[in-house]
Every structure is written in C-alpha cells, then in structure tokens.
Amino acid sequence: MRRLLIFALTAGIALPLVACSSKKETSANIEPVVVETLITATESWNGDSYVYPKGTTQMTLQRITAQPGFKTPLHFHSQPGIAYVVKGSLSCGTLNGKALKAGPGESFATPQESVHYCESVGNEAALVFVASAGVKGQKLTVPYKQ
C-alpha cells in the first residue's frame, strides 16, 4: 500500500511537470513573428527603371481575381508597382516580345511605362495582389491607344 501511495504521488507530481516542460519546449521553438521579404526591386520584370511620379503620394493595394482565359487589353502604368500571385497562373508580355510567367507564391515588379498585357492561364482563376506607389488622382492603369 505504501509503495502504491509513493507511486501515485510521484506520478501526480512528475506527469504535470513533464507536460509543462513539453509545452514550454514547443512554444520556445515558435517565433512570435516571422518577416519574409518577398520581393525587392529597382526595376520591373522587363527592365523598366522606376521613377516616382511627382505630386501627393497615394499608395494602393488591389486584390484582383481574373477568371481563366481573361486577358487585359494592352495598357501601361505611370507608377511603380509589385504583384504577388496567390493562386492560379499569369502570363504577361510586352510589345517588344519580353514575357513573364508567374504562379502561386511568386512576386514580380510590374512594368512602368512599358505597354503590356497579362492573362490568366490554366484552369483556375488567378488571385493576385498588386501594390502601387502612385500619385493622388492619377490612373493606376492607362489604356494603350495605337
């Protein structure tokens, strides 16, 4: 009986300590915050150098969903921008024949002043976030007139 009592007391004290120790070990290995730079660029994917427009800065973040087969008309941007593909795939091209393909988890710097298009390719809609550093009142996308 005495052995059983000692065993029960030892187990009653040791098991919670083991459980607490395990939790502390697990939480100590998890970073409270992880910062990962997805893209840093001084020029766009097609080689455009960036120039910030003059005026009152206006930052914009767009969430774009493009159904399979959707293709933008030819256009250009007057401001620097970056894009992040969440799902689906994009194929983009310029008038001078430069091309880009981007899929889930990929980022790219958008062209500035170069006429281009982008198309949602594949069987699922493309979900893309685009951040732009423009000027208040300025259009983010300017249609190309031939």
What kind of feature is each model-predicted range?
Residues 4-5, 17-60, 109, 143-146:
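A short, N-terminal "cap"/entry segment at the start of jelly-roll beta-barrel domains
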Residues 66, 96-113:
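Short acidic-glycine-tyrosine-enriched beta hairpin
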Residues 9, 13-17:
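Hydrophobic core
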Residues 2-10:
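Sec-dependent signal peptide recognition
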Residues 71-73, 91, 106-108, 112-119:
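Histidine-centered metal-chelating micro-motifs
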Residues 53-57, 69-82:
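A short beta-loop-beta micro-motif enriched in histidine and acidic residues
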Residues 77-96:
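Glycine- and acidic-residue-biased ligand/ion/polar-headgroup-sensing regions
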Residues 112-139:
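Ligand-binding loop in jelly-roll beta-barrel domains
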